[in-house]
Amino acid sequence: MDVNPTLLFLKVPAQNAISTTFPYTGDPPYSHGTGTGYTMDTVNRTHQYSEKGKWTTNTETGAPQLNPIDGPLPENHEPSGYAQTDCVLEAMAFLEESHPGIFENSCLETMEVVQQTRVDKLTQGRQTYDWTLNRNQPAATALANTIEVFRSNDLTANESGRLIDFLKDVMESMDKEEMEITTHFQRKRRIRDNMTKKMVTQRTIGKKKQRLNKKSYLIRALTLNTMTKDAERGKLKRRAIATPGMQIRGFVYFVETLARSICEKLEQSGLPVGGNEKKAKLANVVRKMMTNSQDTELSFTITGDNTKWNENQNPRMFLAMITYITRNQPDWFRNVLSIAPIMFSNKMARLGKGYMFESKSMKLRTQIPAEMLANIDLKYFNELTKKKIEKIRPLLIDGTASLSPGMMMGMFNMLSTVLGVSILNLGQKRYTKTTYWWDGLQSSDDFALIVNAPNHEGIQAGVDRFYRTCKLVGINMSKKKSYINRTGTFEFTSFFYRYGFVANFSMELPSFGVSGINESADMSIGVTVIKNNMINNDLGPATAQMALQLFIKDYRYTYRCHRGDTQIQTRRSFELKKLWEQTRSKAGLLVSDGGPNLYNIRNLHIPEVCLKWELMDEDYQGRLCNPLNPFVSHKEIESVNNAVVMPAHGPAKSMEYDAVATTHSWIPKRNRSILNTSQRGILEDEQMYQKCCNLFEKFFPSSSYRRPVGISSMVEAMVSRARIDARIDFESGRIKKEEFAEIMKICSTIEELRRQK
């Protein structure tokens, strides 16, 4: 019989079925080709929102810049970026009045962080614009390259390893008349292969020195590279995101540290907490509003949406906020924090790879790099692209577009949240001085607004007042996309509230399944995801049991490890059948060795090896977990590992799972094809870095090499440690006199070599 799916929903409130409408099954859409068009859209839109501002020219780079601050007050509902400085400062003052000492305390906390943070903080994060090579690199490599270039240009403050000293170098580098950098390039040669006698292309990697004058260097230092945001569900159009270079990152980090510290103290802020903690925080605000709207008051909630949040924000506004927040602090601290917004006011957006053209008739393809867009004949482009290029041309310098207004995605999430909360804070009766009042929640560009008033007119007046107040600071509430409901039903950051939060289970769907790390980790992550969803997301016992069975099936197909007694034929079935027949206690075999599944929803918290240990044959135990077995991973065995899981929205989350090192926890080798590319130099650097760190950890087993103490270099630290250890070992009779003398001699040689270098 066919089941009519609508019957499933007869007894379910609509809000609880919300998760069935989310576009989270199947693969998310990825972008192909270049992001140049999306970036030009961003730049053009941002300028359009601020078009009535004042144009100036940057004296150092010659870049034209548009400043909309204190521009005309809006006359219509179009989004605009004309924030009024005095309004922003007043909102900050009222925020401080409602939370006495909040700025002062946050500044003190941040000052401590600024003095303690090491420069390796910048190695966190993924792709980073590497200004020395003019393209994206992993963060650690980009940082290493930057420090290397600084060093060769006589900037050495960063040797001590504090981030603040690295930032001093950045400031000094901007005053230099020229910077010398090393760039990588490829040489291709056609040579005859000795074995096959065919002609082959041989690539060699060369390094060459290049001098950048002050203007070119500044442009690179202020550049944000752009890419297309991938895997965005529920959208028809792609959009551009930015990755800043190393010069900007450190300054942004300190500003965000300050803003994060403020957000933690604001009850309306949805950042920096997440998950259940965030839900609890939100529920508190809703409870407060509903309790206060006694029988005499109405309470309504707006599920809010802001138009182009980032593109209407302005770094100059953030500078004003920081100036106010840090007003009683020492000058050095105020200066460090004001550099990020100043750099953003002068930022340049790199247009990406450019356009690809192909001629169908001549079977030709050619790449038009972004640098050429400034003076290429526009007849080759379609109308839409022509318009974009014409509009952006006055802003172009060296393939980058001057972009003074706007913020680019995800740069100052915390600080912009502080701005949003400061407007929510103005909804208290003592500020509105009338019968309506409001409160709400803010998390970056997402907000929920709760308005209370004695009657409908009051609610309308409250919403209007909020809307207009937002306009004054460059926040544009979208009247089309925001909707209002009786309080008790709303959505905020994809949490759906209906007299309490309903589980939006579909959001977690992408993290179910086999991760593809290795057999051991995948099994552990798979069951942990199911366990976590039973705890946090209303995954019921029956559904969880089904999810588990589907997972095991998926796992067996992925690793071709069907049960030893199955009829399914795969590449591995011959070996697994043999193992099955030799094994006395078949229940002890791991699923990945063709064993049965012993998991059910009661024992998901136990790693599979532990679950089956007592059931295993002795020789199987010996093979599986023997440290002398060359296939057992020899990484340090930690009881807890971290996996990256992809929830449906928001960044990839880190999830802990139990790790037991066995023959199944192998680590796949790096793809060899990288060795023939220009990335090879980078790979060698990375391996070198790895070797140094491993060596360092041998000398300081209890430490993590991330926290060097004092200002001695790693080598000096290791030499002095070696001398101390050797003396102790010699005096306690663990080593002979000759060995002790040899160690001392090696130490002296190392020091001598360092001096000569």
Swiss-Prot record:
Superkingdom per UniProt: Viruses
Ranges where the record places region Disordered: 50-81
One annotated GO molecular function: RNA-directed RNA polymerase activity
GO terms under cellular component: host cell cytoplasm; host cell nucleus
Nuclear localization signal, short sequence motif: residues: 187-195, 203-216
Xref: PROSITE patterns: RDRP_SSRNA_NEG_SEG
UniProt keyword list: Eukaryotic host gene expression shutoff by virus, Eukaryotic host transcription shutoff by virus, Host cytoplasm, Host gene expression shutoff by virus, Host nucleus, Host-virus interaction, Inhibition of host RNA polymerase II by virus, Nucleotide-binding, Nucleotidyltransferase, Phosphoprotein, RNA-directed RNA polymerase, Transferase, Viral RNA replication, Viral transcription
Domain RdRp catalytic: 286-483
Composition bias type Polar residues, residue spans: 55-64
Alphabetized Pfam families for the sequence: Flu_PB1 (PF00602)
PTM note: Phosphorylated by host PRKCA.
Subcellular location: Host nucleus; Host cytoplasm
Catalysed transformations (reactions): RNA(n) + a ribonucleoside 5'-triphosphate = RNA(n+1) + diphosphate
GO biological process, one term: DNA-templated transcription
Enzyme nomenclature, EC number: 2.7.7.48
Region (Promoter-binding site), start-end ranges: 249-256
Quaternary context: Influenza RNA polymerase is composed of three subunits: PB1, PB2 and PA. Interacts (via N-terminus) with PA (via C-terminus). Interacts (via C-terminus) with PB2 (via N-terminus); this interaction is essential for transcription initiation.
Entry similarity comment: Belongs to the influenza viruses polymerase PB1 family.
Name assigned to this protein: RNA-directed RNA polymerase catalytic subunit
The species this protein was found in: Influenza A virus (strain A/Silky Chicken/Hong Kong/YU100/2002 H5N1 genotype X3)
Gene, per the UniProt record: PB1
